[in-house]
């Protein structure tokens, strides 16, 4: 397959599936199996940087607000209004989520060789069930004021989301709603907690960059990143709209359809 077409497909899939609750890693694995498309480390780094840039742009005002609150807190110039307290709690929550996500992610990485094609299909079904439960009123526990417990649960879930076929956004939003957070807040927590995880992952992969085979030139790599960025902007807006309108079950239907189709083809 022509490299230009490969990078366009990879950029499209990464941009769409990173934010929609359908598992980007699961879909990239499907591409690898059926279209013989692999994802070199250097290209993986560019694609993830492009998608995290989408989150930063989409939540730029919120991120700036949190950064300013944190700086004022460090400089002891914070007036500690109710809003300031809420923002500090969110920062603390994201830090706790990041810590436990890293722990679970490191543990799961050790068993990467066990990520079989059948496991991906099974995880697609698990994700579809979680999305279905979000829309059909799961039992909600009021633990959102317990920052540590909330961070622990969401962090563990986000770590599990590293498994191909499990949607990171889907499972973290499920956990947040289960804890009593609103849909809007759950979405914010899910996307903001993605930023430190992606940057941490890119930092760890940086050394591998020089050990990998470069099969794409710089133009092709940038082209893939641009496609990931453009379709990422589209998919994050679509996901926000569908979550607010209680239509995540569409993604459940999609995932079950994918599993059925793949099972039929294989």
UniProtKB/Swiss-Prot annotation:
Spell out the GO cellular component terms annotated for this protein, sorted alphabetically and separated by semicolons: plasma membrane
Output the Gene Ontology terms for molecular function. undecaprenyl-diphosphatase activity
Q: Is Cell membrane among this UniProt entry's keywords?
A: yes
Quote the catalytic activity from the record.
di-trans,octa-cis-undecaprenyl diphosphate + H2O = di-trans,octa-cis-undecaprenyl phosphate + phosphate + H(+)
Q: What topology does it adopt in the membrane? A: Multi-pass membrane protein
One Gene Ontology term of the biological-process aspect is: response to antibiotic
E.C. designation(s):
3.6.1.27
Key word Ligase present: no
Annotated HAMAP family: Undec_diphosphatase
Name under which the protein is recorded: Undecaprenyl-diphosphatase
């Amino acid at each position: 397959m022509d490299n230009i077409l490969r990078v366009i497909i990879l950029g499209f899939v990464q941009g769409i599936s990173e934010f929609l609750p359908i598992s980007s890693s699961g879909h990239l694995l499907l591409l690898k199996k059926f279209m013989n498309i692999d994802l070199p480390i250097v290209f993986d780094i560019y694609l993830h940087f492009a998608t995290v840039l989408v989150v930063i742009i989409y939540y730029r005002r919120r991120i700036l607000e949190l950064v300013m609150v944190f700086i004022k807190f460090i400089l002891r110039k914070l007036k500690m209004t109710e809003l300031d307290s809420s923002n500090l709690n969110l920062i603390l929550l994201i830090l706790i989520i990041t810590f436990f996500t890293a722990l679970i992610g490191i543990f799961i990485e050790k068993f990467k060789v066990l990520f079989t094609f059948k496991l991906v299909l099974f995880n697609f079904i698990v994700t579809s069930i979680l999305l279905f439960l979000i829309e059909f009123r799961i039992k909600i526990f009021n633990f959102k004021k317990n920052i540590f417990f909330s961070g622990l649960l969401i962090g563990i879930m986000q770590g599990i989301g590293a498994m191909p076929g499990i949607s990171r956004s889907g499972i973290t939003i499920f956990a947040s709603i289960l804890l009593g957070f609103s849909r809007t807040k759950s979405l914010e927590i899910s996307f903001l907690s993605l930023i430190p995880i992606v940057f941490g992952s890119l930092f760890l992969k940086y050394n591998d960059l020089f050990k990998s085979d470069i099969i794409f030139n710089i133009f092709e790599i940038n082209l893939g990143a641009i496609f990931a960025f453009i379709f990422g902007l589209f998919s994050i807006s679509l996901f926000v709209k569908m979550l607010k309108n209680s239509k995540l079950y569409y993604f459940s239907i999609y995932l079950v359809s994918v599993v059925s189709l793949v099972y039929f083809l294989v």
